[in-house]
Every structure is written in structure tokens, then in C-alpha cells.
Amino acid sequence: MRDVFEVGAQDGLARIGELDVPRAGVTVETPTLMPVVNPNLITVEPSRFVDEFGAELLITNSYIINSDDDLRERALDEGLHEMLGFDGAIMTDSGSFQLAEYGEIDTDTEAILRFQHDIGSDIGTPVDIPTPPDADREQAAAELETTQQRLELAETVDVGDMLVNAPVQGATQPDLREQAGAHAYGTALDLFPVGAVVPLMNQYRYDDMTEAVLAAKRGLGRDAPVHLFGAGHPMMFALAAALGCDLFDSAAYAIYARDDRYLTVSGTEHLDDLHYFPCDCPVCAEHSPQAVRGMAAGDRERLLAEHNLHVSFGEIRRVKQAIKSGTLMELVAARAHAHPSTLDGYRALLDHSDQLEASDPASKDAFFYTGAGSARRPEVHRHHQRLDRLDVDGDDVLLTEGDSNHRYDESWNVLPPFGPYPSALATTYPLTAETPARMDRAGYEAAAEGVCRLAEANPDTAFTLAHDDWPESALEAVPQRVSLYNAVRGE
């Protein structure tokens, strides 16, 4: 067990956690967002982060500080906390982003870790190699080997009680990501950033991002705190949490504000296109878009950055509540349908229902069917997998969406998308699900999969499925030996 991270409530891979940061003397509740602070260009004073926005942790770049003589001297003299005016925990990056952007940097793992320690960082980062997406396998494997060597070197650097990140690389090669996760987890390092996914997010390739993160998670242990490097847009926090990520960082709040862009949970709006602010944060409650457009550039940038922080931390709180109440997948589905790319990410997530199911609580408060994706959720997968454990009494069994019939030895209920279940389970989760009266094709097809599973597990039992006018695509999936009766048409 890693002593610095404790997992609490879970919903699939998502969890509420407590990250102990000993050097800062604080415990951070996750999931959480780290505002990125560029010490050369501060848009919102970090001294405001804790009380006004709820930030417990920020991230800044030690390479930028080390490369500027004035900043370097200030940081060494004052320490990061005093220099930035921030009382929470501080994570520092090593310059790997600059390495990805410019191809080289003037530092190494040992030197930058010692510098991070000397300026008072609470969580440091070695210099890893951020292999770009779609790099060929040879490049990805070679650069991963270099990263792993640097992680092993980082273990040997004496940094006191400063925590150290162990970045997980591997480009878009799932097996390399999984291998990288296992190697990183096997070190004595503390946190596990999934790196080099910013290009995927910038290109709206949320499906590929999902595959990369889930592969890394397969290599990491349950007690590994995971940081999704560069995840700063609130539209994808719910998805990222559902992937099992605990820490996100946002430079977007400031970068977007500089370009008059306004973040929402469903995308990005340009200030010029807004007649009303669709938000009740202090900035939006006290100003109109017209008033903000008329301000001086610096004031406009600051207010937009403040809004962007408010909406981002508001979404983090919403994600936490959804995890606590067991409704995160409903939130993910709602966010996914706001943009085709997040929908791709959601569908990629559902392709791994077995991985989600392994850590999903067996019982929650409610299951809401909100669309075709709900038919592929872990709860449906789990129900189908467990059908062969249930005893069927009798040789002639009715599976029905309606009332039981005493002409059969036994009657089972049928509820799309789950399919058949004994009436004794009717009041248990997830069979208490709220489903629409007009079920979609995917829900019926999933129910048919459940019928197949039950029939396969009981080859000597005769089954009759009394359905409420299911579509042909679902009926075609039912085994031929199962008799069909359309209860709506009476045939």
C-alpha cells in the first residue's frame, strides 16, 4: 500500500481519495484540479485560489523558474510558497513539456529534482520523454525505456519528504502504456501522471485518450494516485474521473481567457458570441457579456480567467458528488452528448465494461437509463455474467415483461437492458432502474443478450419470452429454441 493515498467512495474506476502531501502538511481530497501558474504571466493571484475557488494544490514549472535568473534567485531565497503566495500544496513540472515542444532542454533528472526540492516544491517530477501520439512502436518503446531509466534514477535522489511523480508514457500503444504503468508502480515513487496526452485532447481524440489511460490503469495498482497531465477543460472532467484519474491540471483557465474564450461544461464559447452568461458564478452574476467586452484587455482577461476557474472547480465538485451518490456514469453520459468527441470517449470507455465492473460497487442508490450507452454499462455486464449463477426451477419457464402465468413452472421478470431475472430480485440494485417507457433498440438488444446467457446456462429448460413488441434486431439475437410471444400483438 502507498501510504500517501487512501481510496474512499468508488463508482466504477472513479473514486474519492485523500492524498497526503507531507512536505506541505496538507491532505488533498481528490478528484481535484491544479491551476497551472506561469510565474512570468500570472492572470489570477494564487493567494486567491484557496478561499475563492477551492484549490488545494497548484502546479508550476520548475524548468521555467530555473531558466530565469531572477525567478531562480527569488525561488531559492523565498521558497515557492512565499514567492507565489500560496498556502496549499505545490507540484512542479520538470520541463518535459518544453522537451516535447522544442526537442531539447538544458537539465537532467537529478539536477531538476534537487532544484525542485531546494525551492520548496511539495511534489516533484523527473525529466521523462513525452512520446507523441502515433509514434511508431520502435520510437515509443525506445523512449519509454529512457523514461523508465530516469524513474529508477529518480528513486536514488534524496529529496527528503518531497513526493515524486512517476510519469507513464507509451504513446498510443496500449501494451506499452500498461507495461509503463506496471513499471512505474513498481518503483518507490508516489504519484503517476499519464503523460503526452495533451496532443490527443487538442485534436479532440478523446477515444484514443481513453484507451491510453485505461491501459495505464491496468498496469497501476488500485492505490496509485493518477494525474491526467494537461486535462484542464471542464467538459471532460467527468470522463477523466470515470477513467480512474484523480488529479487534473488546468492552464486552460488562463490561456483561453487571453483569447476571450469562456469555458463551459459542454464546450467553449467566444465572448463575442455571448448575449448572456449561462453561469451563476460571481463573475457572471455581476457582469454582462456586453460589460466585459467593453473592459480594458487586462481586466477582461482576469474576469474571464476567474469565471473559467469557477466553472472548472464547480464541475469538480459536481463530479465528486456524483461519485458519492453512485451516479457518475449518468453525468458522464450527459457531458458526452454535448460534443461528438466526448461521445467517442464515452463509447471507448464502455468498450471496457469488464475493467470498470471489477471495481464498481455491487449496489448503489439508482440506475438511470439515459440512452444507448446505458445498455453497455458495467451493471448490465455484471448482471449478464451472473445469470448462470441463478437457479431456474422447472422445465418450462416464462420470461416476461408483464404478469406471471401459472401455466409455466416458473415466471421470471424481464427488464431491458438487463434482461431476465427472478422476481425475488426485483427490489435489488440495479433492477430497480429507472427506464424510459419508450426504450431504444440498444436496450432491447442488451436484454436479448441476457436471454441468451440464461438459455445457454440452462440447456435443458424450455423458455418462452413474452415481449412487448421488441424490434427485430433484438428478437434475432434470441436463441431459436426460445419461444417468442408478442404480448402487445397477442401473437
From Swiss-Prot:
Binds 1 zinc ion per subunit. Pathway: tRNA modification; archaeosine-tRNA biosynthesis. Keywords: Glycosyltransferase, Metal-binding, Transferase, tRNA processing, Zinc. It is an enzyme of class 2 (transferase). Zn(2+) binds at residues 279, 281, 284. The active site is at 93 (nucleophile). One of its GO terms (cellular component) is cytoplasm. Gene3D superfamilies: Queuine tRNA-ribosyltransferase-like (3.20.20.105). GO terms for biological process: tRNA wobble guanine modification. Pfam families: TGT. Its cofactor is Zn(2+). One of its GO terms (molecular function) is pentosyltransferase activity. HAMAP family: TgtA_arch. Belongs to the archaeosine tRNA-ribosyltransferase family. Exchanges the guanine residue with 7-cyano-7-deazaguanine (preQ0) at position 15 in the dihydrouridine loop (D-loop) of archaeal tRNAs. This is tRNA-guanine(15) transglycosylase. It comes from Halobacterium salinarum (strain ATCC 700922 / JCM 11081 / NRC-1).
